[in-house]
UniProtKB/Swiss-Prot annotation:
Alphabetized SMART domains for the sequence: RING
GO molecular function, one term: ubiquitin-protein transferase activity
Entry GO terms, CC: plasma membrane
Lineage, opening ranks: Eukaryota, Viridiplantae, Streptophyta, Embryophyta, Tracheophyta
Entry comment on modification after translation: Auto-ubiquitinated.
UniProt xrefs under InterPro entries: ATL1/ATL16-like, Znf_RING, Znf_RING/FYVE/PHD
GO BP annotations, alphabetical order: defense response; positive regulation of programmed cell death; programmed cell death; protein autoubiquitination; protein ubiquitination; response to bacterium; response to molecule of fungal origin
Organism of derivation: Arabidopsis thaliana (Mouse-ear cress)
Protein name, entry field: E3 ubiquitin-protein ligase RING1
Subcellular location(s) of the protein: Cell membrane
Length: 301
């Protein structure tokens, strides 16, 4: 029910003391408090903190499990396996240490005396002795009357400092890669040529020994086949043997074959005689059966 504020004010103004109005009409109630947000914040914070603690526990247990497995595997490894692993590691380190880049590989060049023996000429533009007007090592142009070193084979010219530094680690021209000095033949070739007749004589001696061994082998095998060849050789017709044997060698070969044939015939004759005598002896030693024995009763009667 709505109140008429004017009437209330007028009725209060009639009294001198204004507290009477407040006693009769109390003040309005205070506004309601705001809704409690702490009721939702507390459970969420508890869940977040609990999940973080649980995650840390899982990580800690996983770390303990991994370290325990590593200890077990290390204890189960034999000393031989550990030594093999150490050897493999050392081999890998050695291979890696042996690896060098191209510019770190040491190369062998010419001696200082050989470098100084190369011709030094003065540069003059109109002469035409030197091809080009610049050094291929430092790429600087030649100056008039400048001392240059002229390589003997390819006739390329370079500055003295440039080519001397190059030739200390190389043996060829930096421009065309031609060898700077001629390669002389080693002196041991002369000794090889001197010993060559000795080697040829030793080879001849070896050939003779091999031929004598082959003759001995021919004396043992196939006497009947060799007899045909011996008859052919004994007929007086000796043909030239190609390449390896001379006429004297063929005659000696025929003589050897004849001797082998004679020995083969003697062996065959003695063998057949021994075989015949042994078979005859066996027949004499065999007992005679009773049915084949001659009867003596007829003669006694």
């Amino acid at each position: 029910m709505a109140f008429n504020h004017r009437k209330m004010l007028l009725s209060c103004l009639q009294f001198k003391d204004l507290r009477f109005c407040f006693r009769q009409y109390p003040p309005p109630p205070p506004p309601p408090p705001p809704p409690r947000e702490l009721s939702l914040l507390l459970p969420t914070s508890i869940c977040v903190v609990g999940s973080i603690i649980l995650f840390l526990f899982l990580v800690f247990f996983l770390y303990l499990h991994i370290t325990q497995q590593r200890r077990i595997s290390a204890a189960s490894v034999t000393p031989g396996d550990t030594n093999q692993q150490e050897d493999e590691d050392e081999t890998e380190e050695r291979d890696f240490s042996d690896f060098h880049h191209v510019w770190q590989i040491p190369t062998v060049g010419l001696h200082r005396s050989a470098i100084n023996s190369i011709t030094v000429v003065g540069f003059k533009k109109g002469e035409g002795i030197i091809d080009g007007t610049e050094c291929s090592v430092c790429l600087n142009e030649f100056e008039e009357d400048e001392s240059l070193r002229l390589l003997p084979k390819c006739s390329h010219a370079f500055h003295l400092n440039c080519i001397d530094t190059w030739l200390l680690s190389h043996k060829n021209c930096p421009l065309c890669r031609a060898p700077v000095l001629l390669i002389t033949e080693p002196p041991h070739q002369e000794t090889e040529t001197n010993h060559q007749p000795d080697s040829e004589s030793s080879n001849d001696l070896r050939g003779r020994q091999d031929s004598s061994r082959s003759r001995r082998n021919h004396n043992i095998f196939l006497p009947r086949a060799q007899s045909d060849l011996a008859n052919y050789c004994g007929s007086g017709r000796v043909e030239n043997v190609r390449r390896s044997f001379s006429i004297g060698g063929s005659l000696s070969l025929c003589d050897g074959i004849n001797n082998a044939t004679r020995s083969g015939r003697q062996f065959y004759t003695s063998f057949s005689a021994n075989l015949f005598s042994s078979s005859r002896r066996v027949r004499n030693e065999q007992p005679i059966p009773q049915n084949q024995m001659p009867s003596v009763t007829g003669n006694t009667s």
